[in-house]
């Protein structure tokens, strides 16, 4: 993830 909303989908993958 971390494509559209990294802070919501996966914070660890900014």
UniProtKB/Swiss-Prot annotation:
A GO-annotated cellular component: chloroplast thylakoid
UniProt keyword annotations, A-Z: Chloroplast, Plastid, Thylakoid
Localisation per UniProt entry: Plastid, Chloroplast thylakoid
Superkingdom classification of source: Eukaryota
Main location: plastid
Note: On the 2D-gel the determined pI of this protein is: 8.5, its MW is: 16.9 kDa.
The protein's name in its UniProt record: Unknown protein from spot 251 of 2D-PAGE of thylakoid
Upper taxonomic lineage: Eukaryota, Viridiplantae, Streptophyta, Embryophyta, Tracheophyta
């Amino acid at each position: 993830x971390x494509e559209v909303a990294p802070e919501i989908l996966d914070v660890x993958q900014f």
